[in-house]
Amino acid sequence: MQRPRVLSGVQPTGALHLGNWLGAIRNWVDLQSSHDTYVCVVDLHAITVPHDPERLAEESLSTAALYLACGMDPDLCSIFVQSQVSAHSELCWLLNCVTPLNWLERMIQFKEKSVKQGDNVSVGLLDYPVLMAADILLYDADLVPVGEDQKQHLELARDIAQQRINARFGSEEKPVLKVPDPLIIKEGARVMSLSDGRSKMSKSDPNEGSRITLLDPPELITKKIKRAKTDPQMGLQFGNPDRPEADNLLGIYAILSGRGRDAAAQECAEMGWGTFKPLLADATVSALEPIQHRYQQLMGDRIELIRVLDQGRTRAEETAQATLQRVRQALGFLIAS
């Protein structure tokens, strides 16, 4: 029986943090043994906003190394760099030509980011969701792990596939593109900022104390957790909308300590912040230590790391080219012999 296919990825710019790991990568690790898993370093997305060209390649390698250090197995999944598979850019262009402009202008993330960019906002930022659609549709993905903030982008990919490609160039019996479904994983899916329990932990937050990166040393982790925003109440609990920081930090502890939500809630029900924060810091340091150790090993052997990426690229290109050929034929292009 063919395994359901999953596609996901993370931008290489900025250090990966607890939110990336607990909300995404940890779930990919669980999926890879039961799903045909494609994981890419989405460097083409990274250049839709100003970036440092002298750091992009190194950050791409670093991100791939962290995927592996977190438990992704190149024998069970395909790990590759997005820009090294040219079909992403070509399919994006083909999808651009059938996607209405107003579909992109209503994207919430574009509205938010374009305000920050002002007059410097790029066409690439507007077109980001179409490139994301190309990423997904290229691999005939059955499922796409998404958080709440990415659901709108996946819905766009589904609409492009159904309404703009399959309905116009295919048939119900013979669709051109597979329409993917969302895979929304609840626990740990949304890790919030250490400085604001109502905002998602983010690489782009100018306050570095708002996030714990996967490569932070123990003393910095302890410092960030010590300074994390709290409230004046004694005892930690889940589900109180007036205590978002308690919910967030207790949720992180439940996962990183391995205790689970029920046991963590019981343990910390009457605990003060002064007692809880060192516990959380110790659990975080212990959880990240093996990842950091493996990462250093991988970055010390660039030849092996690049071999893994080449292997993943070869697999990805085979799948992507087959999809791209179907789309070219459906749109009526002259196919090279």
UniProtKB/Swiss-Prot annotation:
InterPro entries hit by this protein: aa-tRNA-synth_Ic, Rossmann-like_a/b/a_fold, Trp-tRNA-ligase, Trp-tRNA-ligase_bac-type, Trp-tRNA_synthetase
Residues given in the record as ATP binding sites: 11-13, 19-20, 147-149, 191, 200-204
UniProt keyword list: Aminoacyl-tRNA synthetase, ATP-binding, Cytoplasm, Ligase, Nucleotide-binding, Protein biosynthesis
Broad enzyme group: ligase
Compartment(s) where it occurs, according to its Swiss-Prot or TrEMBL record: Cytoplasm
CDD domains (UniProt xref): TrpRS_core
CC annotations in GO: cytoplasm
Reaction equations catalysed: tRNA(Trp) + L-tryptophan + ATP = L-tryptophyl-tRNA(Trp) + AMP + diphosphate + H(+)
Motif 'KMSKS' region positions after renumbering to this chain: 200-204
EC number, as in UniProt: 6.1.1.2
Top-level taxonomic group: Bacteria
Binding residues annotated for L-tryptophan, in chain numbering: 135
GO biological process per UniProt: tryptophanyl-tRNA aminoacylation
Record motif 'HIGH' region, residues: 12-20
GO MF term set: ATP binding; tryptophan-tRNA ligase activity
HAMAP family listed in its UniProt record: Trp_tRNA_synth_B
Function recorded in the entry: Catalyzes the attachment of tryptophan to tRNA(Trp).
Subunit and partners: Homodimer.
Family recorded in the similarity comment: Belongs to the class-I aminoacyl-tRNA synthetase family.
Protein name: Tryptophan--tRNA ligase
Gene for this chain: trpS
